[in-house]
């Protein structure tokens, strides 16, 4: 839990600007619910915090103006970052999906791990049987 607090604190430091957004509190039951089915915890124009539940691989993603921070709380996954996105298609401004990554780095994520994926970095849950994580997205202006 201390690691999660550190991750959220890091996200807040990245976001230090004018007036702070309101404090958001969610009790343990709602956090568990968010983790069980991929649910939003809080969001505003500067950041988003969600519980992410995965039982299968995903698509390659790239966010031009968003840094993703993941804190794994259960399970494991093979997560690929960097390299070149293959068959990239823009889904909306600044957001891309693809089918594969060429030349990326593989990370074996497990409980307790944190990974920070800077904006403009392809990333991909390549192999997953179960991986629950907190995801913090920090938006660049």
Placement of each model-derived feature along the sequence:
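Ligand-binding loop in jelly-roll beta-barrel domains
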Residues: 108-113, 119-141
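Short acidic-glycine-tyrosine-enriched beta hairpin
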Residues: 84, 89-119
